[in-house]
Amino acid sequence: MATPPSQVRQNYHQDCEAAINRQINLELYASYVYLSMSYYFDRDDVALKNFAKYFLHQSHEEREHAEKLMKLQNQRGGRIFLQDIKKPDRDDWENGLTAMECALHLEKNVNQSLLELHKLATEKNDPHLCDFIETHYLDEQVKAIKQLGDHVTNLRKMGAPKYGMAEYLFDKHTLGESDS
């Protein structure tokens, strides 16, 4: 049975609707990756509780991003079509530096996708979608990328992963004192 057209839909191009659904999938994938990271660092043979806490917080944030997009999709009269969520590329995150580097790469990919979504919204003359992306996503992405870049730099300066003490101290003093 075909889905009836929305009575609230206005100036919402089907390409934007499809792109929002792809972005929802990407945000859920990012949440899934961070969840994998979190429980890797929570393992008894890894035991870096603040890395685990940090990545769990990131997982929740990414899921909230997906939910915000789902709410937008309904508000604009679009239809949500969920896709399979790809499993993370790895199950063993090796060490804190590797995980932070992977997280940085992931956030840059999410940011690029958001920039492309913004470009599409501009091309389709959708100021509401442009404003939504600018207000709720772009600034937060830039801050997340900067924070992860700083974490990668500090872990490298401390000698991670060669010196295990570096990760322990980073876990305790950097991640242990942060709000996330």
UniProtKB/Swiss-Prot annotation:
Its main location: cytoplasm. It comes from the Eukaryota. Residues 10-159 form the Ferritin-like diiron domain. Fe cation 1 binds at E27, E62, H65. It is found in: Cytoplasm; Lysosome; Cytoplasmic vesicle, Autophagosome. Keywords: Cytoplasm, Cytoplasmic vesicle, Iron, Iron storage, Lysosome, Metal-binding, Oxidoreductase. GO terms for cellular component: autophagosome; cytoplasm; cytoplasmic vesicle; lysosome. Gene3D superfamilies: 1.20.1260.10. Pfam families: Ferritin. It catalyses: 4 Fe(2+) + O2 + 4 H(+) = 4 Fe(3+) + 2 H2O. Its EC number is 1.16.3.1. It is an enzyme of class 1 (oxidoreductase). The keyword Iron applies. One of its GO terms (molecular function) is ferrous iron binding. One of its GO terms (biological process) is intracellular iron ion homeostasis. InterPro entries: Ferritin, Ferritin-like, Ferritin-like_diiron, Ferritin-like_SF, Ferritin_CS, Ferritin_DPS_dom. Fe cation 2 binds at E62, E107, Q141. Oligomer of 24 subunits. There are two types of subunits: L (light) chain and H (heavy) chain. The major chain can be light or heavy, depending on the species and tissue type. The functional molecule forms a roughly spherical shell with a diameter of 12 nm and contains a central cavity into which the insoluble mineral iron core is deposited. Belongs to the ferritin family. Stores iron in a soluble, non-toxic, readily available form. Important for iron homeostasis. Has ferroxidase activity. Iron is taken up in the ferrous form and deposited as ferric hydroxides after oxidation. Also plays a role in delivery of iron to cells. Mediates iron uptake in capsule cells of the developing kidney. Delivery to lysosomes is mediated by the cargo receptor NCOA4 for autophagic degradation and release of iron. PANTHER family: FERRITIN, FERRITIN HEAVY CHAIN. This is Ferritin heavy chain. The gene is FTH.
